Structure formats: C-alpha cells, structure tokens
Amino acid sequence: MKTILFIFLSTLLFETPTIEKDRDRWKPYYTDAAPAKTADQWYLPFDVTNRKKVNNIKIISIFGDHRDSYVKGHIHTAIDINPAKPRAKLVNVYAMANGIVCSVHLGENQRTVVVKHKLPNGQIMFTSYKHLKEVYVSNGQAVDQNTKLARLFTPQESKKYGGDYHHLHLEIRKKFDDYGCASWLTFNDTQLNDRFYNPQRFIKEHVK
C-alpha cells in the first residue's frame, strides 16, 4: 500500500491529472458484483446510541468546498464527520445499508472502502468511506448495517501524517466509473453533480 500511495502522489506532482487519464490505474481494485439484497433502510455509519438520529454525527467539513490538498482547487466530494459523542476511544465505521464491497483502495491515511448498493427501484449507487486506519472487509463481501467495515484514526495516529485524518470522509455516489479518482480530481460543479450526491442532504432524506 505504501508503494501505491507513493505512485499516486508522484503522478499528481508531475502531470496534469484528470479523471479520464487516471481512472484506469484504479480499476484493478474494483470488483463488479451485484448486491444480493436491496438497500431499503439507511443508518448512520457509526456505533452511536441511535443510528437513525441525524444529530448523532458532527459535521467537520461540508460538501462542495474547494481544497488545496493533493490537487490544488479540487472540490470536496464528501462530508467529513465524526460521532457527536463517541462511545469508545477507537471509532468504528459501519456500512450504511445492505450492499457489497466493490473496492478497497489507496493506503496509509487515504485507505478507502466502497460499498455498492441496489435501491428498491433497481437503481445502483455507492457509499465510500475514506481515512481508515484498519479495514475489516474485502472485495465481494456482502454487508449490512451491522457490518464493521473499518476503524478511524485516533488523533494521535493522525499526527504521524501531519494532518487531521481522524474523521470519516463520507461520499454518497451516483456512480463509480472513475474507480475512486474523482474523489481528488473533481474540479467543477458539473463533475461534482454528475457523480456525487450531497451526503448531508442524502442522510437527512434517508436516515429516518
């Protein structure tokens, strides 16, 4: 994973990246499998007292703001969140609904798990969970809201990387044809709205 992260950072430094140029590098980490169960109930991704109560999460950074990290000027494709009241020192991350793990990619402080979901109307969508210290699932694994996907960094572990990585970067995706690289290569609202839902709005509408 360290080698993958080094190649990833080197590429961003020495050429002008685009989703079209970069996505094929990430395709090998993708498994194209169909979820066995529909995602008809949605939950917060943390072990909080009530996973249906939206104010049990704390939003640290919003969807759609502009970032200078990695690629200058890219748009934040997620919300960054933590439990409002963590129940333990180590914060675990859970799947938000029935689905299947379709990608585990990147390494170190950017480790990411992506879950593919099928809605009751047959529509396919994805949830993506980034900044994971430890991952407990693998590609092709069926998950539900009780599946522990990973755990987050502690503040102390985060310091090793010189940033504040002790939070969950949560994306709600319309599609995953970029195999993950749109997370850091989205530069305008057209690209943003083509692939991503606003997670804060999605949670408000579906977690209830």
Residue positions per predicted region:
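Short, flexible loop/turn elements at secondary-structure junctions
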Residues: 63, 83-85, 97, 119, ...
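Extracytoplasmic/periplasmic, Sec-exported soluble proteins
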Residues: 73, 91-93, 135-138, 191
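Sec-dependent N-terminal signal peptides
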Residues: 3-12
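Zn2+-dependent peptidoglycan hydrolase active-site motif and core
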Residues: 95-136, 163-167
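Surface-exposed, glycine-biased beta-strand/turn segments
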Residues: 16-111, 145, 158, 196-208
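Conserved, short, structured surface segments that act as functional micro-motifs
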Residues: 141-208
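Intrinsically disordered, low-complexity boundary segments flanking structured domains
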Residues: 64-69, 114-118, 137-138, 159, ...
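Short, solvent-exposed loop/turn segments that connect beta-strands within catalytic domains
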Residues: 87-89, 119-124, 178-182
